[in-house]
C-alpha cells in the first residue's frame, strides 16, 4: 500500500512495483481509519499528524507489517525512513535568494513541526531571516481558514522590509502567499520573491506568476523507499537511522526572476543583460549603452552584487537557459542561442560548471 498524493512519488513506486511484481493500492486519506478491504505485506507512507492514520499504522506495525515513511514530519513514529535532507533544501533556497541579492528573508509556514524546523535550520544558516508561523501567532484560528491566514499575511506584509525573499514549506503555502501579495498590490518578484519548499509543476506553473521551487527529488525518494520496503519484506533489519539524500536543484520560475539592486546603474545594466542575451550583449557594449566605462560598470556591479559584471552576465545567461530547458519542447541548440551561448557545447560546459548537470539531465 502507498499513501501519497504527489504524482512523482506515485510514478516512482509504480515503476518499482512493475519491475518487482508488486500489487499496489494507493490511499491518499484514510477516511474511516483504514483502507477498504486491504490485506498486504508492506506500506510506503507519508506520515503526518493524522490521528486515524497514526492509529492504523500502529496497528499494522503491531502485526509485523513493515512501514517506510517518505517524510521526516513524525520522527517519533518508529519505522524506517527515506527522505530528502530538509536542512540542505533550506540552504539551497537561501543561496538562491542571496544570488539574486535579496537580503531580507523570511520563512513562512502555516504550522510548525520537525520538517519545517529542519527547513528553517538550513534557511537560517545564510543569515538572520524572519519567521512567520501562523499557528504560533494565531493559535485559536483554524489552519485551513484561508481568510484568516490572508488577513494575517496582510498585517505581516505591512511591516516587512522590501524587497523580501520568502521561502514556504509547502506548495500550497507558496500559492497562498502569492495570492495575498497580488491582492495587496505587492509586485512579485520585484518586491517579493517566493520559493516553494517542494515542487509540484502542475500547481506552481499554473499561477499568475509561476513559482520557483526546491526540487526535493521526491521520485528518487519514493523509489528508494520502495527498494527499502522490499528489503524489509524480505527480512532485512530496518536501518538504525533515517536515510537522507540531497535536494536535486532549484527550479527557477518567474517568482524569483529578478536581481535586487539599489544602484540605478546596476539595475539598468541587469535589464540590458537580460534583454540582450539573444543579440550577444557583452559587458563592453552594455557599458557603452549606459554611457560609462567598462571599469566603472564593473566596479558598481561588484560593489552592489559582490561579483563582477562578467559573472553577472554569465548568471543571466544561465538563468535564461534553465528557464528554457524546463520546457522539453525547446531543443538544446535553441536554448543556447536564445541565452547567448555560442553553441550547445558551450552551454553544456557552463551548466556543468554551475550545477554539475548536462542540459539533458537538468531537464529530467
Residue ranges of each PLM-predicted region?
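Bacterial carbohydrate/catabolite-sensing allosteric modules
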Residues: 1-47, 51-289, 298, 315, ...
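Basic/polar phosphate-binding segments, predominantly the helix-turn-helix DNA-binding elements
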Residues: 283-313, 336-361
Amino acid at each position: 500500500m502507498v499513501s501519497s498524493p504527489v504524482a512523482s512519488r506515485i510514478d516512482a513506486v509504480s515503476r518499482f512495483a512493475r519491475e518487482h511484481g508488486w500489487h499496489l493500492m494507493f490511499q491518499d486519506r484514510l477516511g474511516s481509519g483504514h483502507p477498504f478491504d486491504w490485506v498486504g505485506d508492506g506500506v510506503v507512507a507519508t506520515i503526518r499528524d493524522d490521528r486515524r492514520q497514526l492509529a492504523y499504522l500502529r496497528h499494522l506495525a503491531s502485526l509485523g507489517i513493515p512501514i517506510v515513511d517518505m517524510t521526516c514530519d513524525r520522527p517519533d513514529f518508529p519505522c524506517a525512513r527515506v527522505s530528502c535532507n530538509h536542512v540542505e533544501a533550506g540552504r539551497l533556497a537561501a543561496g538562491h535568494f542571496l544570488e539574486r541579492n535579496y537580503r531580507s528573508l523570511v520563512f513562512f509556514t502555516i504550522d510548525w513541526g520537525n520538517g519545517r524546523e529542519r527547513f528553517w535550520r538550513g534557511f537560517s544558516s545564510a543569515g538572520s531571516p524572519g519567521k512567520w508561523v501562523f499557528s504560533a501567532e494565531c493559535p485559536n484560528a483554524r489552519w485551513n481558514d484561508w481568510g484568516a491566514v490572508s488577513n494575517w499575511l496582510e498585517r505581516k506584509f505591512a511591516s516587512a522590509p522590501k524587497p523580501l525573499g520568502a521561502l514556504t514549506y509547502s506548495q500550497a503555502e507558496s500559492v497562498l502567499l502569492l495570492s495575498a501579495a497580488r491582492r495587496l498590490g505587492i509586485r512579485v518578484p520585484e518586491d517579493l520573491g517566493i520559493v516553494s519548499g517542494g515542487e509540484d509543476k502542475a500547481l506552481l506553473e499554473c499561477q499568475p506568476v509561476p513559482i520557483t521551487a526546491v526540487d526535493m527529488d521526491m521520485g528518487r525518494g519514493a523509489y528508494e523507499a520502495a527498494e527499502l520496503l522490499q528489503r524489509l519484506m524480505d527480512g532485512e533489519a530496518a536501518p538504525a537511522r533515517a536515510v537522507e539524500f540531497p535536494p536535486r536543484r532549484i527550479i527557477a520560475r518567474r517568482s524569483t526572476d529578478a536581481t535586487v539592486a539599489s544602484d540605478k546603474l546596476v539595475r539598468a545594466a541587469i535589464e540590458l543583460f537580460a534583454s540582450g542575451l539573444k543579440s550577444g550583449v557583452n559587458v563592453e557594449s552594455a557599458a557603452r549603452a549606459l554611457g560609462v566605462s567598462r571599469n566603472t560598470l564593473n566596479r558598481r556591479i561588484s560593489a552592489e552584487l559582490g561579483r563582477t559584471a562578467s559573472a553577472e552576465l554569465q548568471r543571466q545567461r544561465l538563468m535564461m537557459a534553465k528557464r528554457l530547458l524546463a520546457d522539453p519542447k525547446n531543443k538544446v541548440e535553441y536554448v543556447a542561442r536564445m541565452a547567448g551561448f555560442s553553441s550547445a557545447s558551450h552551454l553544456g560546459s557552463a551548466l556543468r560548471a554551475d550545477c554539475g548537470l548536462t542540459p539533458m539531465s537538468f531537464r529530467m
